Amino acid sequence: GIIEHIFKIVPNTMHFVEIGFGYYEFNSMNLIKKGWSGKLIDVDNDEVIALKKNLNHYYKNIKVEVINTKILKKNINELITEKIQTNWIDFFSLDIDSNDYWVLETLDLSKVRVLCCEYNHWLGSERKLTIKYNEDFKFKDNGVWGASLLALTELLKNKNFSLIAVESSGTNAFFVNNKYKDKFEVLSPSKSFRSVGRFYSADKKKEIYKNIKQSKLFIEV
């Protein structure tokens, strides 16, 4: 997989932080299987309880903290840096389907080696769009959520990260700290853009694009 390939190249201390997960599927699962330690954070208490049970059953001796909390601009840096026993976060994953752009903008990423974040594929490849910051935002699969790949790439470029991979499924993008960028091909967000839209019916896609066009929740950044 992409993560495994990246960490064959990027040095690491086997430490991760992942924000936003499903108990049955998340980006750090294979890292945990390999003995990595870290934090898993999600706002959904049911997901947190289910994941704790799964991890305790299958991986009894792991050093993974599962935290139930809402991610906000005012608490993100404290959550990420608190009690971390290493100077670096080797793998940081963000997928909250809402204020992702604003969380990344606020977060100190200087000690992150590799970053993965979900982008809103419905927003296309050419516009720098994100939803306005809204602590009460609730995700709906209507196209109105998160940020475009171009917006995230430009934001992270200003934080010394480069785009090096995009999942073929059109879900996640991977960025590397510029300390390691010479080891990879740096990608263009417009040329590497992928979309999940092919899995939706024509009527559903038409509805989603209409929602996006009419929404007052997006802003250009």
Language-model regions, residue ranges each:
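A short helix->loop->beta-strand "cap" motif at the edges of active sites that frequently abuts
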Residues: 36, 111-113, 161
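Active-site glycine- and acidic-residue-rich loops that bind
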Residues: 93-103
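A short alpha/beta connector and helix-capping loop motif
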Residues: 66, 102-138
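Short amphipathic alpha-helix with an adjacent loop that forms part of the alpha/beta core around
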Residues: 76-86, 105-108
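Rossmann-like AdoMet/SAM-dependent catalytic core
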Residues: 1-12, 17, 27, 34, ...
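Short SAM/SAH-binding signature in class I
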Residues: 87-93, 114
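Structured loop/turn residues at beta-strand edges in well-structured enzyme cores
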Residues: 11, 87, 110
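SAM cofactor-binding core of SAM-dependent methyltransferases
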Residues: 1-82, 91-94, 121-124
